[in-house]
Regions:
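Structured C-terminal cap/extension of enzyme domains
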Residues: 27, 35-38, 42-43, 62, ...
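Short catalytic-loop micro-motif centered on adjacent basic/acidic residues
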Residues: 44-51, 141-145, 168, 244-246
Length: 375
């Protein structure tokens, strides 16, 4: 496939966590990152209509498509269920995405955040059929899905729609054997259906960058000076069916680090596989909340109490893992302020749980947060 062959390296720029100046994207910084990425031989970019409340697609136009020839890069966008109610809504949404990103076609167009519930809606609205029509018209080169559910659901989707060409999955060494995320089992379904794989969350929302103090020595003992991010990203990239591993880089320094070890990619060694499994065991012993900070739970008014759910979970993990004394102050004086409610003020509506890609029991977890910080 022409587009697949044009993917220069196994590393992509996920434009979900871009550097910000307040409420706006720092386009100067992003442009610098884009240029550095392309100058070092990389060419895969990923966005979605809802990322940063629509600012990600606009940043693609400002920082990428208006500054680089279309032949220099591969661009993936996604069809998200929350932005359409019926089939007739899909084409206008798609055209608005082309306009927002400043291109006249997408290399990959993914049915976004597919799970058992979303798949029903996408079928009812003939979203897959519409995407396949867009491909015939040349507005999309390849149709795929991004997926967050159990392996048997993916098997069902790929069986019903064998035309799907690529699958984006959450895959990292912490989730590899996780019973809820099922990274290993989901990957094996992709192999069964002979579908190449795109990787999201290789560092699990940053959780595999800042390790628990009792886990860090495990990676430090390895021969070499690799960063924590390097071990996480290289782990995912070492599986043979992985075409691109995405990283949601938010600083130029992160970009430099990631490029440094992915420019001349070296697969994982047996020693490294053993080390990251030991790190995963340490994480599991801390019983951390496995939130990736995607913010779906708080976007589009999904939380009527405006609780800062991802930040509270991250703060909880920080205190539990590192014993950070500052976590209590941060909870009471930063996370709970103005219009933002305490964890105890959750009204148990469950809207957050319906959109959580990790299928977390958010209402129960907020009780844990309350018990930790509202003593």
């Amino acid at each position: 496939m022409e587009t697949f062959d044009f993917i220069h390296k196994k590393f992509g720029f996920g434009m979900m966590r871009l550097p910000m100046n307040g409420d706006v994207v720092d386009t100067d910084q992003v442009s610098k990152m884009v240029d550095y990425f392309i100058d070092n031989g990389f060419n895969y970019f990923d966005t979605a209509h809802g990322y940063i409340n629509g600012l990600s697609e606009k940043a693609v136009k400002t920082c990428l498509s208006s500054r680089h020839d279309r032949s220099e890069y591969i661009l993936t966008d996604k069809l998200t269920g929350s932005f359409f109610k019926k089939q007739e809504d899909i084409r206008p949404l798609f055209e608005s995405q082309l306009e927002a990103t400043g291109v006249d076609y997408f290399d990959f167009y993914l049915m976004h955040a597919q799970n058992a519930h979303e798949f029903v809606k996408f079928k009812e609205c003939k979203a897959y059929e519409t995407a396949f029509e867009l491909k015939k018209e040349g507005k999309v080169k390849h149709v795929g899905i991004s997926f967050h559910d159990r392996a048997e659901v993916l098997d069902q989707i790929l069986t019903e729609y064998p035309e799907i060409e690529i699958v984006q999955i959450q895959f990292n060494y912490l989730d590899y054997n996780d019973l809820s995320v099922q990274s290993k089992l989901v990957y094996e379904v992709c192999e069964k259906h002979d579908k190449p794989v795109l990787v999201m969350e290789p560092v699990k929302g940053g959780n595999l960058v800042k390790l628990p103090t009792d886990a860090q020595p495990i990676l430090d003992a390895l021969n070499g000076d690799g960063s924590n991010a390097s071990y996480a990203i290289r782990f995912a990239a070492s599986f043979k069916n992985m075409r691109v591993v995405l990283s949601g880089m938010s600083t130029f320094e992160q970009m430099q680090d990631n490029v440094s070890f992915m420019k001349d990619f070296k697969p994982f060694t047996k020693e490294e596989y053993k080390a990251v499994e030991e790190v995963a065991e340490v994480f599991r012993s801390h019983k951390m909340i496995p939130c990736t900070s995607c913010h779906y739970c708080v976007e589009e008014n999904h939380c009527p109490r405006n609780i800062r759910i991802p930040e509270m979970f991250a703060n909880y993990n920080t205190k539990k893992t590192f014993g950070d004394w500052n976590a209590d102050y941060y909870y009471n004086n930063v996370l709970v302020s103005g219009e933002h409610s305490k964890a105890s003020e959750c009204v148990k509506c469950g809207m957050c749980e319906k959109v959580c890609p990790q299928h977390l029991p958010i209402r129960e977890l907020l009780v844990q947060v309350k018990e930790e910080f509202e003593k």
